[in-house]
Amino acid sequence: MKTLLAKPIVLSPSQLIASGRQRACYHHPEREDLCVKVHHADRDDKETIREIKYYKRIYRNKSSSETISDYYGTQETNMGTGYVFQLIKDKTGAVSNTLDYFFKNKNYFLKHQKNMRIAYDIFKKTIFKDAIVTMALKPYNIVYQLGYKPHGQFVIIDNLGSANLIPVDYFSSTLARTTLSRRFADFERRIYNEYHIKLANMQIQTR
């Protein structure tokens, strides 16, 4: 991996996976299991640096979690510094879709809702067990990986870490889990309000 990251790469529009307010995500041109996140020219990398510090803390403690995508390091690109992450894919090889995609495509959601309900319960329990620190849980920052284990898997791909000057959640699993309780309450409320889906049992609510 060190040898790979030491070599500059060229990213092209055809490799674009998604683009947000802060940065864009591209397929890695040499590794199909990786993606490269690059900040837009008018944005700084403050949020990403915060996130990377949290990843380094996790790895320094020799711990990880199957609920978050892996981080591998930086690599120079023609668009500036790239941050290289695991690219979450379905068993078919397709890039896994975000929860936002599933919830906006109701027929697709209905097809998978039974397994998604089970996978969500496992996701929630695992995050609490691992005391993962996240700024917020958002439907476009979580993907549902089809074909993983019997019921698929939810994975956070963005917005990890804490923006607090003193990130106390890093030092106390109890405090981290207290924060997670609020994060999940906000997340489930948001899903209900925006998509009319009660995430606790994954049923679409009619108006």
Predicted regions and their residues:
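C-lobe/activation-segment region of protein kinase-like
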Residues: 105-115, 119-121, 126-132, 144-207
